[in-house]
Every structure is written in structure tokens, then in C-alpha cells.
Amino acid sequence: MQAGLRIDVDTFRGTREGVPRLLEILDEAQIKATFFFSVGPDNMGRHLWRLIRPQFLWKMLRSNAAGLYGWDILLAGTAWPGKPIGRDLGHLMRQARAAGHEVGLHAWDHHGWQANAGHWSAAQLVEQIRQGVDTLSDILGEKVTCSAAAGWRADERVIEAKQAFGFRYNSDCRGQRVFRPLLADGSVGAPQIPVDLPTFDEVVGPSVAAKDFNAFILDRFRPENLNVYTIHAEVEGILMADDFRRLLAEARQQNIHFQPLGDLLPEFLNSLPVGRVQRGALEGREGWLGVQGA
């Protein structure tokens, strides 16, 4: 059974501590994945202002965010400037690429994108992407060929903004099938490879205990589905690393074969259906996010 493994790296600590651990685990399992890196300032602690929103507060309490992520992640960029992730930790991004993994852009400023992408102008969206692409390209010494919007905050404006960068594909939304997004002028954009499986922080809480998560998620893989699974370096690369190692072993026993997202693209892109990326909602996730539409 084919499956895509996507690894989002949102923070300085996730890069510094989570990425090396994940590279070790993936090497042991002989699995290649796609890493999407945030490369600018780590301002993730500024999300604490969202605690005044009941849905976000409930998510933080439900997932035990302080224990899961650590206070250094939850406070990053609040009382002091955010650390420059790419400048200080670019060698770990090169290490992921040298190990044979696919590497793409997650964000320049992850917090900034999540908080502002919905109302930034077209020029501001392009500038944020450009800063990230230029930085990651300089780090890797090669063209950046794929991207994934931070927090799945993507709509038709974001898809339009990304067209100028010539990405091979993007993974900006939640959905069920690989597709080509329709643009405002009637043409189609770079393929979208959506995520169709829930993440750890979206479901762990009253209904699913952390110890039961592996069984919960593996039960949702289906031969007829896309099976794109997202983990976070801040979670599965640190506190839940041993659980993730066990998940990969159990997946192999169930004939689930993880691969980089780019390997899920068909040989002939014209065979892909056309759809849209539009704003929607998802249980377990606060605020709007991009979803696949007709």
C-alpha cells in the first residue's frame, strides 16, 4: 500500500533536536520522506495571543501543548527576537537532503504566515514566499521544487502567488486526491498533493489517548486512498520519537510503504483532475485552512 510521509519543521528547536532524531529513525527504517522546513525567524510563541480564542485554548489544553512541545517552543519570539532558523541550522537541512530525502519550503516566518496569510496582499504573499525560497535555495545549493503552506493556510490567492516560483508541486491543503488547482485566468497551477490523514495534535485528547494513537492512525490507511500522513519534528522528533519509531515498524508489518510526496505524482500530469483550493474548516484544528474543492 503506497503512502506519503510529510514532515513539517516549524521551529528552531524542532530543527535542532527533532530533525537529527527523525533522520536517524528514518535511516533505521530505510524510509525516505519529504521535509518541509521553516527557514526564517522562529516567532511561534506569538501564537499564545490566540489563547483568547476558545477553540485554540481548547486545542492547547486537549493536546497538553506545554508537555508536548516544551515552553521554549511555546514562548519563542515573544519577549525576544525569534532565532533565525535557516541561518543557524541550515546544515541540518542539507543533512536531510544528503540523506536522500525530498526537501521543500514550509515558510519564511511560520507564525507570520498562519496569522496573516488570509489578509496579506498579493505582493506580501509573494515576498514571504520569495524570502523563504531564496534562503532555502542558498542553504541547499539547488532549486527549491516543492512547498507546503504553514498550517495549511492556503486559498486561491496563495495558489496564484506560488505560481511564479515554478514549484513541481505544492501540498497546501487537506483533501482526498492529487489534483491541479484552477487559477483565476482559467489555467491550471502546479499539482496539489493534499493531506488526507489527521495529525497527532488534531485527534489526541479525550477521544484518543496518546498511547493509542498509532493504532488509531494506522487503521485509517486504505489501499484506495491517497494516504498522505503528516508528522511534526517538534512532536514525533522529540517527545513522541519512540512512538514514531514503533509506528514505522507496525506500518511495515501492515504493508504500508512510505515515500516522499513527489513520488505520488503520476507520470502524466494531464491525467490529474482539476479542482480548487478554498477556505474551509477541520475538526481539531483552530481557524480556517485550505481544503480541496470541486
Curated annotation (Swiss-Prot):
Keywords: Antibiotic resistance, Hydrolase, Lipid A biosynthesis, Lipid biosynthesis, Lipid metabolism, Lipopolysaccharide biosynthesis. GO terms for molecular function: hydrolase activity, acting on carbon-nitrogen (but not peptide) bonds, in linear amides. GO terms for cellular component: membrane. Residues 1-259 form the NodB homology domain. Pathway: Glycolipid biosynthesis; 4-amino-4-deoxy-alpha-L-arabinose undecaprenyl phosphate biosynthesis; 4-amino-4-deoxy-alpha-L-arabinose undecaprenyl phosphate from UDP-4-deoxy-4-formamido-beta-L-arabinose and undecaprenyl phosphate: step 2/2; Bacterial outer membrane biogenesis; lipopolysaccharide biosynthesis. Its EC number is 3.5.1.n3. The keyword Hydrolase applies. It holds the Pfam family Polysacc_deac_1. InterPro entries: ArnD, Glyco_hydro/deAcase_b/a-brl, NODB_dom, Polysacc_deacetylase_ArnD. SUPFAM superfamilies: Glycoside hydrolase/deacetylase. Disulfide bonds: none annotated. It catalyses: 4-deoxy-4-formamido-alpha-L-arabinopyranosyl di-trans,octa-cis-undecaprenyl phosphate + H2O = 4-amino-4-deoxy-alpha-L-arabinopyranosyl di-trans,octa-cis-undecaprenyl phosphate + formate. It is an enzyme of class 3 (hydrolase). GO terms for biological process: 4-amino-4-deoxy-alpha-L-arabinopyranosyl undecaprenyl phosphate biosynthetic process; lipid A biosynthetic process; lipopolysaccharide biosynthetic process; response to antibiotic. Catalyzes the deformylation of 4-deoxy-4-formamido-L-arabinose-phosphoundecaprenol to 4-amino-4-deoxy-L-arabinose-phosphoundecaprenol. The modified arabinose is attached to lipid A and is required for resistance to polymyxin and cationic antimicrobial peptides. Belongs to the polysaccharide deacetylase family. ArnD deformylase subfamily. NCBIfam families: PRK15394.1. HAMAP family: ArnD (MF_01870). This is Probable 4-deoxy-4-formamido-L-arabinose-phosphoundecaprenol deformylase ArnD.
